[in-house]
Amino acid sequence: MPGKKAPNGEFAGRKLKLKRKKFRWSDIRYKRRVLRLKEKSDPLEGAPQARGIVLEKIAVEAKQPNSGMRKAVRVQLIKNGKVVTAFCPGDGAIKFIDEHDEVIIEGIGGPKGGSMGDIPGIRYKVVKVNRVSLKELVKGRKEKPRR
């Protein structure tokens, strides 16, 4: 008669726990969390926001069934030099952003840290331009500082 796989005594708790630990590595979510793979591959390095310099303005075509050009900017992050694309939310918001401006970007809020709605492949959005809120600039409450 073959031996049993798991101990089942009064003091077998530690052994059962160690045995369970081995199998957790086959769970992808556990593995990614423990090895901190998201932070390692994330351009923001796990931070909620990041500062960067605008390299160029671009227009991205919306996904089907929508049509239109979504205005975005290519931003080089100051902390690690990585280049990411960030969406400019708001009507005419792109007009307040020029090349070589300093912007603050954050996640766009899509599912699982991905892109949002009909904007393909863009995971970040611009929040501030030269330390002034982009929302305030678009609404006309504040003016962009002249350098």
Swiss-Prot record:
Q: Which CDD domains match?
A: Ribosomal_S23 (cd03367)
**Family named by the database record:** Belongs to the universal ribosomal protein uS12 family.
The annotated subunit structure for this chain is: Part of the 30S ribosomal subunit.
Q: What are the GO MF terms of this UniProt record?
A: rRNA binding; structural constituent of ribosome
Superkingdom of the source? Archaea
Record keywords, A-Z = Ribonucleoprotein, Ribosomal protein, RNA-binding, rRNA-binding
Keyword RNA-binding: yes or no? yes
A GO biological process of this protein is: translation
In its UniProt entry, what is this protein called? Small ribosomal subunit protein uS12
NCBIfam families from the UniProt entry: PRK04211.1 (NF003254), uS12_E_A (TIGR00982)
List the record's Gene Ontology CC terms alphabetically: small ribosomal subunit
Please give the organism. Pyrococcus abyssi (strain GE5 / Orsay)
Primary role: With S4 and S5 plays an important role in translational accuracy. Located at the interface of the 30S and 50S subunits.
